[in-house]
């Protein structure tokens, strides 16, 4: 019966019996619920108990009901946290390559970071305008792995110490979890085999009365101007609030009166941008038009922009706005071997959230050739087009990239751009302008000359 069970597990998970050579000597899971989506860090000490070197470890990323994996990255501690690219087998199953292969009896420490979406939900789903919000999260007590695990610890970090309910256990006479402030720690020395189906359950309900912003759409356009030495940037964002919805209609009078004593609220009432220090010509618009409810503060190293929407964005509501500005080319550019190099942030929009769909459009100066762009995110679609602006002759190349489910941290990543610039396009434009002026003067002379 045990052999049949092992064979069935092998078929389901895609593992053969010959690959059951790993053992998890220690597993530490850290689940961070302080962000707008769930961040996990799993530290695994794996030991090769086989007779041959192994170069692949199969990992199951645990998710709660309705939760999906947005991103997953792996580093190896023994190799100075060198990264390795996990290979996705199916929804939550990944093969982690190990180079050099792990010899029999040797161990490796894997550090696995993941971003998860859909596991946290408000309960109740609707609240009053000035009522506290409670969120719930569900996970397993033990690591879900096809291999045997000896020691393990699950650590939940919550936004505050206001924890309403959480699951308790008594394991080997020890009361779990150990609670310190906003942290719950479940620790077990019980050996769990890969065939164990009962992984336990951890349920936690906690108070967190803040908005849960999410970017439904992000569009970034950057125009590069060689002759003006400027970058023109435009960011259009559609925000959604995934917090608890309003139980009744919005009371504007109560909202404005509440601003005098700063009550807790699940509404988004401001968005903060950090721009380069020499940014100028900043303007902020939405679907209606220009908005004056914004504040700009210039500091030595950066410029802060605080945007205030026309209305508070409560749970289930959305808001579209666009921010445009200009900044000096030279702050991002360097030249080498007749090539121009630009290191530009992926986006300036606020991080700590998910962007369901993101599009980047890079408009190069006329005369740019041999263009190379290195994007720091996985691209789902890309294309190259050509446009003509005022007095253009050759046209400008536009590189457009699209990505799905871009997560926090990524907006601070860097896009590496390089190209060769032929200044003859600029002089051709001057020649055209000069020729037009001469023709215009000649025509005026022929018309008005006696």
Swiss-Prot record:
Signal peptide start-end: 1-18
Highest taxon in the source lineage: Eukaryota
Annotated keywords: Endoplasmic reticulum, Glycoprotein, Membrane, Signal, Transmembrane, Transmembrane helix
Membrane topology: Single-pass type I membrane protein
UniProt-listed InterPro entries: Ribophorin_I
Pathway info: Protein modification; protein glycosylation
Broad class of the protein's primary localization: endoplasmic reticulum
UniProt GO BP: protein N-linked glycosylation via asparagine
Side Cytoplasmic, residues: 445-450
Residue intervals annotated with topology Lumenal: 19-424
Residues annotated as glycosylated: 290, 383, 405, 422
One GO CC term, this protein: cortical endoplasmic reticulum
Location within or outside the cell: Endoplasmic reticulum membrane
KW Iron (keyword) present: no
Transmembrane segments: 425-444
Function: Subunit of the oligosaccharyl transferase (OST) complex that catalyzes the initial transfer of a defined glycan (Glc(3)Man(9)GlcNAc(2) in eukaryotes) from the lipid carrier dolichol-pyrophosphate to an asparagine residue within an Asn-X-Ser/Thr consensus motif in nascent polypeptide chains, the first step in protein N-glycosylation. N-glycosylation occurs cotranslationally and the complex associates with the Sec61 complex at the channel-forming translocon complex that mediates protein translocation across the endoplasmic reticulum (ER). All subunits are required for a maximal enzyme activity.
Annotated family: Belongs to the OST1 family.
Oligomer status and interactors: Component of the oligosaccharyltransferase (OST) complex.
PANTHER family tied to this protein: DOLICHYL-DIPHOSPHOOLIGOSACCHARIDE--PROTEIN GLYCOSYLTRANSFERASE SUBUNIT 1, RIBOPHORIN I
Name by which UniProt lists this protein: Dolichyl-diphosphooligosaccharide--protein glycosyltransferase subunit 1
Record gene name: ost1
């Amino acid at each position: 019966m045990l052999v049949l069970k092992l064979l069935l597990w092998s078929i389901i998970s895609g593992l053969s019996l010959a690959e059951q050579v790993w053992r998890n000597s220690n597993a530490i899971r850290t689940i961070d619920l302080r962000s707008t989506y769930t961040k996990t860090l799993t530290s695994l000490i794996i030991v090769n108990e086989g007779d041959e070197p192994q170069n692949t470890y199969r990992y199951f990323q645990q998710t709660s009901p309705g939760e999906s994996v947005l991103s997953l990255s792996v580093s190896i501690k023994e190799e100075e946290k060198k990264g390795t690219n996990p290979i996705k087998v199916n929804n939550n199953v990944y093969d982690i390559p190990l180079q050099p292969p792990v010899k029999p009896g040797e161990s490796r420490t894997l550090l696995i970071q993941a971003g998860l979406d859909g596991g946290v939900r408000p309960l109740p789903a609707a609240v009053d305008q000035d009522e506290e919000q409670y969120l719930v999260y569900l996970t397993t007590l033990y690591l879900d792995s096809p291999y045997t695990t000896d020691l393990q610890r699950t650590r939940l970090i919550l936004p505050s110490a206001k924890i309403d309910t959480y699951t308790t256990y008594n394991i080997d006479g020890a009361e779990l979890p150990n609670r310190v402030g906003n942290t719950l720690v479940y620790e077990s020395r019980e050996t769990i085999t890969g065939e164990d189906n009962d992984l336990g359950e951890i349920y936690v309900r906690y108070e967190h009365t803040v908005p849960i912003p999410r970017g439904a759409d992000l569009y970034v356009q950057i125009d590069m101007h060689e002759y003006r030495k400027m970058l023109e940037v435009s960011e259009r964002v559609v925000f959604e609030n995934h917090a608890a919805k309003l139980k009744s209609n919005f009371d504007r009078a109560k909202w404005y009166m509440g601003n005098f004593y700063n009550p807790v609220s699940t509404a988004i009432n401001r968005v903060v941008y950090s721009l380069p220090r020499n940014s100028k010509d900043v303007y902020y618009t939405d679907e209606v038009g220009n908005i004056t409810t914004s504040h700009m503060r210039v500091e030595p190293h950066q410029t802060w922009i605080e945007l205030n929407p026309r209305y508070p964005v409560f749970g289930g509501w959305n808001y579209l706005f666009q921010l445009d500005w200009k900044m000096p080319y030279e702050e991002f550019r360097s030249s080498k071997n007749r090539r121009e190099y630009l290191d530009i942030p992926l986006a300036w929009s606020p991080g700590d959230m998910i962007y369901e769909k993101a599009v980047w459009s890079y408009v190069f100066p006329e005369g740019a050739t041999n263009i190379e762009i290195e994007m720091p995110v996985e691209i789902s679609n890309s294309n190259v087009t050509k446009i003509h602006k005022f007095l253009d002759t050759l046209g400008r190349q536009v590189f457009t990239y699209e990505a799905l489910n871009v997560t926090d941290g990524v907006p601070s990543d860097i896009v590496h751009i390089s190209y060769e610039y032929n200044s003859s396009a600029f002089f051709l434009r001057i020649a055209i302008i000069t020729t037009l002026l001469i023709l215009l003067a000649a025509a005026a002379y022929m018309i008005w000359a006696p």
